[in-house]
Amino acid sequence: DTDMADLVLCKPTELYNILNQSTKFSRLAEPNYLCLLDARSKREYNESHIVTARRAKQDKDENYLLPESVELECVRYCVVYDGNTASLNETGPAIKCSRVVAQVYRYPVLVLEGGYERFSAYYHFFRSQKVFWMPQEIEEFLSYPIEIIPGLLYLGDQRQANDRHIHKDLKINAQVNVSLDPEKNLSSEVHNELHIPVMDSCDSDLLKFFSRACEFIDKHMGTNSAVLVFSKLGISCSSTVVIAYLIYCKKYFLKEAWTHVLTCKPNMRPNRGFVKQLSEWENIILGQQSTDIADPHY
């Protein structure tokens, strides 16, 4: 029998971020990246499900079957959801299905907290009726910015900053452009833009812009407006500003802020110069440098 330790609740924002990881292509195109299982009825699944989910099938006695054509032992994330399971103490479809999967899966099975109902209320644009995905269609799946503070703070790249649908879906009301190019196309329509003209080099001084960036983000988030921080690739410059903001607003030590952003976006990577500047910023905001940046982790 499986132990409950093999199941872990997964917040809607965590699944949203898993769905939106990308390198050159969406990570969803990697065969061993994500197995997303919908444990609801066939009728509910056909009506609408979370994008790329497959239906968990049952035998004639209503026992869940392992998904076919998925090598579960190799998959990095396995997420199971039903209509609205909200705790691991329930006995609904998501828990029953997860227990079957947990017998062969080597990591904890993630059970989506609040199920399809909560997820689709937050992220209506990730509802789908599509059942079969061709590999090329998944490769072309355009990822959305990563969510750092649910509904309020997003981290993205230039393409996402210029995508009208993304702005509308995430209700982006302000953005911070951390790159040398002032964007001419879409961001001129986003009236609230802060441009920080810095290039991704160890010699760039981003520290001198931290206060202005943090105050700008704070001002907009204070009115419950969503803010997108972006740079060309969304990996170094913009993630540095987001980490600086978490130190400023949440009073996180650099280590906590770093871990938070890394959990949301595992390929984020501020350059060495920016790491030193974040360490100075930690000292300015918190009055101490508690994070040892010589640690190879940074």
Regions found by a protein language model. Give the residues of each.
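Thiolate-centered catalytic microenvironments shared by cysteine-dependent enzyme domains
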Residues: 1-8, 51, 56-141
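Local beta-strand N-terminus motif with an aromatic residue
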Residues: 32-34, 50, 75, 172
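Short loop/helix-cap segments at secondary-structure boundaries that form the rim of catalytic
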Residues: 44-52, 167, 182-191
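PTP/DSP superfamily signal
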Residues: 102-153, 161-173, 177-179, 183, ...
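Flexible, polar/low-complexity N-terminal or interdomain linker segments that lie immediately upstream
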Residues: 1-47, 117, 121-166
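Structural scaffold elements adjacent to functional motifs in cytosolic proteins
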Residues: 36-38, 53, 175
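Helix-loop module immediately N-terminal to the HCX5R catalytic loop
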Residues: 26, 30-31, 54-79, 194-228
